Amino acid sequence: MSVGIVGGGLLGLGIANHLASAGVEVELYEADKRLGGLAGSTRIGGVAVDRYYHCVTTTDHKVVSLAESLGLSIRWRPLGVGFFHDGRRCSMSTPLEVLKFPGLRIDDKARLAAFVLACGRISDHEPLDELGIEEWARRKSGNRLWERLWAPLLDSKFDGRYDDLPATYLWSRMRRTAGTRDRKGREVMGAIEGGYQALVDRLAERIRAMGGRIHVNAPVRHIPASASGRALGVVTEGGLREHDVVVTTQLRPNLRGILDASFEEALGEDPLRYMGIVCLVARVKRSVSPYYAINITDRRVPITSVVETTHVVDPAWVDGHLIYVPKYVQSTSPDLARSSEDITEEFLGHVKALFPDFRRDDVIASQVARARVAEPVHVARVENRIPPVFAAPGLAVASSARVHPNIVHGQAIAGVAEHVAGEVIDRLPTFTSQRSAA
C-alpha cells in the first residue's frame, strides 16, 4: 500500500508521519530544496530564522505534544500587545489596559468584554457561516466598535476587502486568543527552539526512520488519471511514480496545471479566495518594540503589524533581535512585484513612524519574503465550503483551507493532517485492490 504526498510543508509532513506510524509506505515530494513551505526558514546575515513569524500558544496541544515527542523544547513567555490608533501607541496587554484604551468609550469597552465572552459561549459555527461579518459584529458589539476597532483591523489584515467575510472569522479569532492568557490577563506564547524549521527537520528524520522516502528538489509536474478515473500516481522529472493514493497539500491556485482535467472537473469551482503576503524580516541590534505585536487601526500606516518575535524567541538563538513587518495583500497586488529595496525602504519607514526611537543603523541584515498565495479566505454563504477529502478514486485533496472554522495556525494544520491521514488509512485497502485489478 503506497501513498504519494505532494508538498513538504507542515501539513504534508504531518500526514506522512501519521501514515508511516500506521505502517503505510509513504513517499513525499517537495519542489523546493528545503522542507517546510511557509513554516520553513531562511538565513538573515548568516543566521537561520523563520521565513515568516510563527508562535505556539498554550492551547496548541497537538503542536506542543509533537515538539516534545521530537525532543524539542518550547520557551514560554507572557507578552505585551499594542495598538496604534489615531497616531498614538498604547498597550492592550491586560484587561485593565483595555479599559484605558483611548479610542473607545466606557460603554464600548463593556460591549467589547461582553462580545469576547459571548464568542466563548458559541460552539456551533455553522449559523455564523451564513452571516456577514459586519452585520454580525455591529449587532453584537455595536456600531462604534465596528467602526473604530473591527473594521480597521480587518482592513489591515485583508488589504481593504473584508465585506464578504463570514462572522465565523471574528468568532474564531476571539476564541483562540481568549484561552491563551495567564492569571494577570496577559497573552502567553511560546517559541520552539530552532524555530519551526527544527520541528520540520525532526519530523522528516522520524518519517525516514520509519521507512518513508522524502524527495526535495522534486516538483510534481502532473497527477494523471487512468481510463476509469483513478489517480495513477505522480509525474516528476524522472517520469511516472505509481501510488495507490496521491495526497495533495497545496491550495487550489497552486494545483492549476498539475491535476488531470477530470480531477479539476470533479473538484468544481473553488469557493474561496486567497491572500498573499509581503513580509520584511530584519535582525536588529536592540529591541524595537515593547510589544510582541502591534495592531494597527490607523490606516495611514499601511502595514498589518510589526511583530518582534524575540520577546518569545531567545535573542541568543538569532544573535540579535528579530522583527517581522508583514503586509497581507490581494494576490494581484503590485507589492508582490516591487523590488526588495523599495519594500525595505518603505516598511522600515513605517516602523520608524510607530517607534520613533528606531534607527536604521540598528539593522544588521534584512530580507523580504513574498507569497502570492499564502492564506485561504472563506467567504459567507457558500455551499461545499469543505469538500470531501477524496475528490476522485485515489486522489485526496488536503490544504490549509480545511482548517475552517479555525484560522490558519500550527494547531489547526496538525488537526487537518490527523483527519486526512485517518481518511486515507480507512480507504487505502479499497484503492489498493482497485490498482491491483487494473
Features from the language model and the residues they span:
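N-terminal Rossmann-like FAD-binding beta1-loop-alpha1 element of flavoenzymes
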Residues: 2-28
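Conserved Rossmann-like nucleotide-cofactor binding loop
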Residues: 11, 34, 253
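Glycine-rich FAD pyrophosphate-binding loop
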Residues: 20-44
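Mid-domain catalytic core of redox enzymes
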Residues: 22, 219-337, 341, 345-358, ...
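Dinucleotide-binding Rossmann-like beta1-alpha1 core, especially the glycine-rich loop
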Residues: 45-127
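Active-site/ligand-binding neighborhood in enzyme catalytic cores
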Residues: 104, 113-223, 232, 249
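Short FAD-binding loop at a beta-strand-to-alpha-helix junction that anchors the flavin cofactor
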Residues: 322-324, 387-406, 412, 416
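Internal hydrophobic alpha-helix adjacent to the cofactor/substrate pocket in enzyme cavities
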Residues: 413-432
